[in-house]
Amino acid sequence: MSHLLTMSELSEQEISEILKDAEDFANGKERKTTEQTFVANLFFENSTRTRFSFEVAEKRLGLEVLDFSADASSVQKGETLYDTIRTLESIGTKAVVIRHEQDRYFDELKDQVNIPILNAGDGCGNHPTQCLLDLLTIKQEFGRFEGLKIAIVGDVRHSRVARSNAEALTKLGATIYFASPEEWKDEENTFGTYKSLDELVPEVDVMMLLRVQHERHDHYETDIMKEYHEQHGLTVEREKRMKEGSIIMHPAPVNRDVEIASELVECERSRIFKQMENGVYVRMAVLKRALPNVLGGMKHELFV
């Protein structure tokens, strides 16, 4: 069964196949099932990009989408996540997409359910489809991962994007650097080296900014925000010193004039909205992987 829970579980070959399928979808090579197939989206945290791009991906593949609301479900009556998934499985759902506030919520589910789980984000833990769409964006830009220098900047400790991306990009041959306020460093993430932002600006090929996750912060950390943009954000002045041909990325939502100057969000270097576009193609690809009997399977040569 093809769960997608973390980037750790994917080999280079599997990453390559997913990205090749995503590129095919981006180039208009869509396939649509004529067999009625139900997929449920279970979002226990707020989401715009991930939730709606999964829904667009599902509908473009001809899947029937069951839109789940935790507030209107039996979760409010104490039903467990396991029982919710087993219920959906029993009534004919073929896969579930889940975003949950609990880190690694899937550990207690993956060996007990009989339908694929696609992780749309777990707490501060993992965000594999965001990582894959970021990989697709980088691949489109540079044609490779090997030898690239990538800075992951900002709220590293609370970021599932930082964890997933640093691990996957290291596996694919890129060099990862982190820049972060001291309080937001993640000592458990060993896939990169910490440097100052100003040192990294002229060196890296990709400046990957992270959202400041106010909802996960302790109250004492609010002091960091007073001068965050000037000290830790991508200002107009810093962008001017970036390496020729380098790009700006951000998983969004963007806090304008916090992580990045507002006028840079859609500047020539920015690939922020391209990432969002690629999210649909990547999620089509992971749905195809999860439902090979419905959507078919293809093998592709390794490109990395």
Swiss-Prot record:
GO process terms (BP): 'de novo' pyrimidine nucleobase biosynthetic process; 'de novo' UMP biosynthetic process; amino acid metabolic process
Binding site residues for carbamoyl phosphate: R49, T50, R99, H127, Q130, A252, P253
Keyword Transferase: yes
GO molecular function: amino acid binding; aspartate carbamoyltransferase activity
Annotated binding of L-aspartate, by residue: K77, R160, R211
EC number(s) stated in the UniProt entry for this protein: 2.1.3.2
Keyword check for Transferase: yes
Keywords, comma-separated and alphabetical: Pyrimidine biosynthesis, Transferase
Coiled coil: none
Catalytic reaction annotation: carbamoyl phosphate + L-aspartate = N-carbamoyl-L-aspartate + phosphate + H(+)
Cellular component, GO annotation: cytosol
Domain of life: Bacteria
Pathway participation: Pyrimidine metabolism; UMP biosynthesis via de novo pathway; (S)-dihydroorotate from bicarbonate: step 2/3
Primary role: Catalyzes the condensation of carbamoyl phosphate and aspartate to form carbamoyl aspartate and inorganic phosphate, the committed step in the de novo pyrimidine nucleotide biosynthesis pathway.
Subunit structure, interactors included: Heterododecamer (2C3:3R2) of six catalytic PyrB chains organized as two trimers (C3), and six regulatory PyrI chains organized as three dimers (R2).
Stated family: Belongs to the aspartate/ornithine carbamoyltransferase superfamily. ATCase family.
Protein name, per record: Aspartate carbamoyltransferase catalytic subunit
UniProt source species: Bacillus mycoides (strain KBAB4) (Bacillus weihenstephanensis)
